[in-house]
Amino acid sequence: MGAPPRNAPVTTGFLVLSSKARDTFRHVTEPAGHALARAGITANGLTAIGLAGSLGAGALIATGQPVVGGAVSLLSGLPDMLDGAVAKASGRASRRGAFLDSVVDRLSDAAVLSGIVFFAVVRDLGTMATLAALVLGLSLIVSYIKARAESLGFACNVGIAERPERVIVLGLALLLGHAVAGLWVLLAGTVITVVQRILVVWQQSDVGPDLGR
């Protein structure tokens, strides 16, 4: 059976919605990026601050301070959301910077979620530990799908639970003392995002599934 057309409704709808969300986000970050660049703040500096904050948040959570850790995690997300805008505003956007940013994002995710796993295991909170481990694994899969798809030439900027959404949901859940509820939301969101990205890439590909196998 042949593949769906490249402009299939599912693919087009996902990409249009994601494009609108990115445009809205860009209207907020671009002015801030220009202001920070004029102040001499560098994109790599912001990336480093974000990573340090995430590592600190993970350590705070692991040592029994999830509320403070949630607040720090939210704050650490701010420089991470602005480093790309600063790089563009300063004319220093590069593939090396994009690569570094992607690696740091994965390390930041791992730091906070690993902190939750440690916190939960020490206190015998099985549900929380399991959810955090699943969200961590699925978050890495979400990122891998995009990286692999783009390396093959496919557009894959879709998903209801990309990194900014994950940082906000998890940070607020920890801050408000509802970590398990937040993790359930993230689990559902990351599963949906995995499916969205697979569908988008599948419908852009030339080879469809062989239903006779």
Please name every model-derived segment.
Residues 37, 61, 88, 150, ...:
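Short polybasic/polar patches that bind polyanions
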Residues 30-42:
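Cytosolic juxtamembrane amphipathic/interface segments immediately preceding
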Residues 40, 60-64, 115, 175-176:
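Helix-loop junctions at the membrane-solvent interface of multi-pass transporters
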Residues 16-19, 23, 40-43, 66-69, ...:
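Residues at secondary-structure transition points
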Residues 2-33, 102-213:
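A feature for the membrane-embedded catalytic helix bundles of lipid/isoprenoid biosynthetic enzymes
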Residues 2, 38, 46, 55, ...:
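Structured catalytic core of nucleotide-sugar glycosyltransferases
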Residues 47-96, 126-137, 179-189:
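Membrane-embedded alpha-helical segments that form the functional core of polytopic membrane enzymes
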